[in-house]
């Protein structure tokens, strides 16, 4: 359940998962849908919250844990006692984090504030306050991998957009692809495929970079609602990783603890991925209609 919850919360906010930025870049360039941090949260937080209610309950029923009763209060009190009072560095980090969230949300109410600038200022404060040292930054290889690869992929995406590659591909598919079904059915089919195909990918970034532009282009060529389709794929990008224990980076770490066998994990993952997919449409479409994002 710990892993399953992380895959749901990963799509609820733009900053919840690093590949979300890349996914939004593709969605914006191919469908025209662009969102601020607050708009993303408004659109996807409610479907995510509903999933957070049902997914752990179903997961508990599918793979019941050996320990069903624990003294939460005592464990929390013991853990808090071990941590001790908040250090000054932790207080500074908490304030910086809250201010960064506010900064990312401000553009949605008319403030001309770059999310990148907010992130850089927050990182600079954290660095000069000594919360993160240069050695910490150098030794965190995953961060540098993300920085380099995301920069390269975003640059390639921009170049393809300027060359009108995605527009050409959409026009070509529209002229040669015959899908005699309604646009909503196309969204259902493509989003389901986007979840199933995650069995072939051990990285959200790899999936987004290689498959998301294809799904987006096929969908646009079929006349789908760009806003609905973009929102759906932004969500399936994350919870599609439910299907396997290697669908995202936390999976192998949690699986290696030895609490679950492969059969139970994959069974629970498949069932919960389907449940999440259903809840996305059952909750998402009425919610997006209510807030005026789709007609």
What do these predicted regions represent?
Residues 100-103, 153-171, 223, 227, ...:
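Hydrophobic alpha-helical transmembrane segments in multi-pass integral membrane proteins
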Residues 6-8, 77-82, 145-160, 213-223, ...:
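Small-residue-rich segments of transmembrane alpha-helices in multi-pass membrane proteins
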Residues 57-61, 86-91, 99-141:
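Flexible hinge motifs at transmembrane-helix junctions and intramembrane kinks/re-entrant loops
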Residues 136-170, 181-196, 200:
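Core transmembrane alpha-helical segments of multi-pass membrane transporters/permeases
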Residues 9-19, 114, 159-166, 197-210, ...:
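Short helix-coil transition sites and intra-membrane helix breaks within transmembrane domains
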Residues 44-48, 84-93, 113-118, 138-154, ...:
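Helical membrane-embedded segments and adjacent short helical loop/helix-boundary regions
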Residues 1-5, 11-22, 26-84, 92, ...:
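Juxtamembrane and boundary regions of transmembrane helices in multi-pass small-molecule transporters
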Residues 179-222, 226, 233-234:
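Hydrophobic alpha-helical transmembrane segments of multi-pass integral membrane proteins
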């Amino acid at each position: 359940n710990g892993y399953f919850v992380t895959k749901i919360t990963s799509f609820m906010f733009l900053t919840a998962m690093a590949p979300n930025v890349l996914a939004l870049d593709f969605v914006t360039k191919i469908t025209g849908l662009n969102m601020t941090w607050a708009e993303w949260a408004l659109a996807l937080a409610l479907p995510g919250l509903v999933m957070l209610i049902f997914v752990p309950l179903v997961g508990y029923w599918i793979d019941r844990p050996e320990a069903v009763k624990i003294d939460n209060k005592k464990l929390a009190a013991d853990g808090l006692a071990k941590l001790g009072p908040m250090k000054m560095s932790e207080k500074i980090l908490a304030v910086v984090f809250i201010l960064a969230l506010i900064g990312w949300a401000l553009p949605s109410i008319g403030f001309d504030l770059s999310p990148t600038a907010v992130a850089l200022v927050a990182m600079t404060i954290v660095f000069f306050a000594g919360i993160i040292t240069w050695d910490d930054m150098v030794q965190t290889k995953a961060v540098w991998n993300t920085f380099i690869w995301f920069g390269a992929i975003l640059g390639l995406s921009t170049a393809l957009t300027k060359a009108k590659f995605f527009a050409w591909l959409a026009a070509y598919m529209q002229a040669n692809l015959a899908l005699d079904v309604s646009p909503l059915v196309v969204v259902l089919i493509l989003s389901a495929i986007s979840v199933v195909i995650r069995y072939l990918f051990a990285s959200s970034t790899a999936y987004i970079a290689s498959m998301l532009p294809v799904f987006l282009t096929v969908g646009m060529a079929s006349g789908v609602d760009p806003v609905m389709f973009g929102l759906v794929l932004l969500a399936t990008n994350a919870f599609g990783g439910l299907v396997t224990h290697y669908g995202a980076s936390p999976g192998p770490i949690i699986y290696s603890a030895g609490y679950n066998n492969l059969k139970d994990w994959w069974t629970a993952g498949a069932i919960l991925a389907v449940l999440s997919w259903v809840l996305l449409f059952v909750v998402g479409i009425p919610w997006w209609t209510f807030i005026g994002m789709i007609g």
